[in-house]
Amino acid sequence: MKRSPEDIQSEFDKEGASRSPIQIEDIVIGANAKEELLRFLQKKCWNHPVIVCDRNTYEAAGRLLADELRAGGIKASKVIIPEHEAGAAAADERTLVYTLINLAEETDVIIAAGAGTIHDITRFAAYQRGLPFISFPTAPSVDGFTSAGAPLILNGIKTTIQTKAPIALFADTNVLKEAPRSMTAAGFGDMLGKITSLADWEISRRLAGEPYSEAGAKLVKDALWQCIDHRAAIAMGTEAGIQILMEALIVSGLVMLALDHSRPASGGEHHISHWIEMEMLKAKQPPILHGAKVGCACAVLSDTYKELACHEKLAELPPHFREAIQSAYEGLPDGKTIAGWLASAGGPACFDEIGVKQDLVSDALKHAHTLRDRYTGLTIINENAALFAHHLHQ
């Protein structure tokens, strides 16, 4: 990996920025990651790992990983998370309890073999049991693999619980290349979401005094553009393309970990995604990949923010508000461009393509800003609803 945790930390140190230590001991991305994971366990003298996976990720990687570990003398066992009625595993109370009660007493480390939801379940279970956990992604689909926060569905509400980051991450490109194209496209969509999250972060700094880091913004922006520039290779699933996407997702996650907040990588587009997810959960509808929702939300929100930046009513706000809004949002790529990038990576380009109705998107534009105590363009639009909301919510 080109950007190690030490590299990330040194960028913040050069800036003199306050940061939290990144306590991830090893990150390996490559065709030999399974073997490296075995060596890591042997070095740590951990002999009773539990692999947490779902039915799909067990077949994709969990079974082979368990065989590899057992061949190396490690007594690996597994917990296969059951699907819910809607057809996929969910990080909710039922699943969390199921995982905890199925962890053997002698477990000394937990391995998350899956994508975002499996990691959220695993990190919470590891935190509750006081155990380390290792990340073994099966798809380059989200930037949360290295996160210390676990976004869970508690009482039907998306709630992030602070837990722990993985002690190590091993991403096997032979596994990642075989991931469904939709999941790779979701990872690309999660990265494209940084277009609006970085703009929202600038707004939160200038208008709400929220913490900001130039170094963090540059690291995430560089990772974003690596993905945009190599979107063809990512879409084709080449080893180089998958490596670039996975590294970008990990860099984004490490920046959040160092800053101890998610502002550089999660703005209004993520709030919209979370709102839609919760509404679909209430309706017992099948879940949609996180990155697919984020990418579509980014395209919608970028156009919304660009309209805000040139809105005739902007003149009624204080001058420093106008300047900040125009500086952050005028130069964003338009939604059509973002949709084109999403499509070129093999993903959905608009909410219609993933079955999300326009009225739900409109509701999200009106209410999603209430999900997080964070200042974004959505906050501005809805706190000044008499000026902007009716037009921009369309």
Swiss-Prot record:
Catalytic activity: sn-glycerol 1-phosphate + NAD(+) = dihydroxyacetone phosphate + NADH + H(+); sn-glycerol 1-phosphate + NADP(+) = dihydroxyacetone phosphate + NADPH + H(+)
Sites where the protein binds substrate: 143, 190, 274
MF-aspect GO terms: glycerol-1-phosphate dehydrogenase (NAD+) activity; glycerol-1-phosphate dehydrogenase (NADP+) activity; metal ion binding
Cofactor-binding details, from the entry: Binds 1 nickel ion per subunit.
Keyword Metal-binding on entry: yes
Cofactor(s) it depends on: Ni(2+)
UniProt entry keywords in alphabetical sequence: Cytoplasm, Lipid biosynthesis, Lipid metabolism, Metal-binding, NAD, NADP, Nickel, Oxidoreductase, Phospholipid biosynthesis, Phospholipid metabolism
Main location: cytoplasm
Class of this enzyme: oxidoreductase
Localization in the cell: Cytoplasm
Entry annotated with the keyword Lipid biosynthesis: yes
Family label: Belongs to the glycerol-1-phosphate dehydrogenase family.
Protein name: Glycerol-1-phosphate dehydrogenase [NAD(P)+]
Biological source species: Bacillus velezensis (strain DSM 23117 / BGSC 10A6 / LMG 26770 / FZB42)
